[in-house]
């Protein structure tokens, strides 16, 4: 009996020591983040607030925090080990931070935050903890705005594609158009598909929401990927229909209302329609799976 009591006490002491290591590790992580990245984090939040193209960034840390919260009960039960292999990941993150600061690359500085956080998680929690939190860490990348050079490589082709698609649809409804680049010339007005109307804002936001949606409502990794990728053509088509609708309103309704109220309001409407289309895609995938299993 006494021997069993000693065994239980040793087990309790070991568990307490592991919990202490766990708490110490994450305390150091928080302190390091605040010391090294506080300025970058403040600037990132300001970017989310001031730039409508990346305003979805506010949702990402909330989602990542929720993922950690959901797993909170299982995390302390994992075997906590200090894994020094994670130091190499931290070192990589610090190299990216150095290159970002002295190479004047805000993107590298922000990416380094995720890399360092991943490395520290590996250091103080080992593979078991990193395995549990890998998606929460990976999803943080969605909160980081793309570099301007990559952003423009996406936005500019979207502008031309959207204007081209809308200019093909309008004549089908009796609206004569002449398109030059991203300019759509109607009988009474020229419509410019500017960067803000390229659809990249709704594309990035819808893609982010598709990732969240897939994580919560799908267990299959492949179907999660399909859901996320399907958000891209959905967002592009929705934006083209929005421009097309604006052209119809200019021609058959009121120019000022079309370019003002309708153009703004239709953005919200088409985004809700896009969410509905995402849900339909998911239902079709599930139905196809059921039919395939029955066959």
Annotate each PLM feature.
Residues 2-295:
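Hydrophobic N-terminal alpha-helices or hydrophobic patches in metabolic proteins across all domains
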């Amino acid at each position: 009996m006494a021997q069993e009591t000693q065994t239980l006490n040793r087990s309790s002491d070991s568990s307490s020591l592991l919990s202490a290591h766990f708490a110490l590790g994450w305390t150091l992580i928080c302190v390091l983040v605040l010391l090294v990245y506080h300025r970058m984090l403040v600037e990132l939040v300001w970017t989310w607030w001031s730039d409508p193209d990346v305003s979805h960034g506010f949702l990402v840390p909330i989602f990542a925090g929720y993922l950690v919260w959901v797993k909170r009960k299982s995390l302390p039960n994992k075997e906590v080990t200090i894994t020094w292999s994670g130091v190499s990941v931290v070192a990589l993150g610090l190299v990216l931070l150095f290159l970002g600061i002295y190479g004047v690359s805000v993107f590298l500085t922000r990416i380094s935050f995720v890399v360092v956080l991943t490395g520290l998680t590996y250091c103080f929690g080992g593979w078991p903890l990193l395995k549990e939190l890998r998606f929460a860490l990976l999803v943080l990348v969605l909160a980081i705005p793309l570099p301007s050079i990559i952003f423009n490589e996406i936005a500019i082709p979207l502008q031309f594609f959207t204007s081209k698609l809308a200019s093909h649809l309008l004549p089908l409804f009796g609206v004569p158009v002449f398109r030059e680049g991203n300019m759509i010339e109607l009988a009474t007005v020229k419509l410019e598909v500017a960067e803000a109307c390229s659809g990249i804002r709704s594309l990035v936001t819808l893609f982010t929401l598709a990732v969240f949606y897939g994580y919560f409502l799908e267990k299959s990794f492949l179907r999660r990927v399909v859901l996320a990728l399907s958000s891209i053509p959905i967002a592009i088509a929705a934006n083209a229909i929005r421009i097309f609708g604006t052209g119809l309103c200019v021609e058959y309704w009121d120019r000022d209302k079309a370019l003002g109220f309708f153009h703004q309001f239709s953005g919200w409407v088409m985004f809700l329609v896009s969410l509905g289309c995402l849900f339909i895609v998911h239902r079709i995938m599930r139905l196809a799976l059921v039919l395939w299993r029955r066959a």
